[in-house]
A protein has these predicted regions:
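Auxiliary, metal-adjacent structural segments of Zn-dependent hydrolase domains
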Residues: 80-150
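Active-site recognition of the HExxH zinc-binding catalytic motif
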Residues: 143-144, 149-178
Length: 178
């Protein structure tokens, strides 16, 4: 029976550091790129076109202010990361609602959903993905951080036209029914 929904912002926190440091031309160790590439938040999106080496190459090119050449997914990942560095204030406004996000109420709301009796814990991970809006992998819902749209008026966030918490609830329902 579903008892917990855990929020994982590890990849977003790491990338917030990276975007700030890279924009200020600080030195970022190459080992950082390898560590980020190993995070489950990113590795869940790996396939024959996009892998850990894609992540490392894109982030290294940004840090070193080099031109980047890659396939469509790699270029999308590189472009999204460049976009985050253009306006760090906007980037922070995307991250702030996540830091305040409390998903505890969804546990009771999802009781009775088909499949909720088979999984004890769901992990909701926010990740800087290339093009996928979200990925369901086992008991993990991985949401593309780049798809978050902050709202200046009420400090809520949206993905598409859906308020973030409602979006997460709908995707967890999908996860539970798989």
């Amino acid at each position: 029976m579903l008892q917990r929904i855990r929020l994982n912002l590890e990849a977003v926190e790491a990338m917030l550091y990276y975007w700030q440091a890279a924009s200020e031309k600080d030195n970022i160790a190459e080992s950082f790129f390898y560590d980020v590439a190993k995070m489950p938040a990113l590795s869940a999106a790996y396939d024959e076109e996009f892998d850990g080496e894609s992540v490392r190459r894109a982030l290294s090119a940004i840090k070193n202010r080099e031109r980047f050449d890659g396939n469509k997914k790699e270029k999308k990942f590189w472009n999204n990361n460049m976009w985050m560095m253009e306006d760090l204030e906007y980037t922070r406004s995307m991250a702030n609602p996540l830091k305040k996000l409390n998903l505890d109420s969804l546990v009771s709301e999802l009781q009775g959903t088909p499949g909720s009796d088979k999984i004890e814990e769901v992990e909701v991970i926010f990740s800087p993905l290339h093009s996928d809006e979200y990925i369901i992998s086992g008991n993990r819902l991985i949401v593309n951080f780049f798809r978050i749209k902050p709202n200046d008026v009420d400090e809520k966030a949206y993905i598409g036209e859906k308020e973030l918490k409602l979006y997460i609830k709908e995707k967890i329902e999908e996860l539970l029914q798989k």
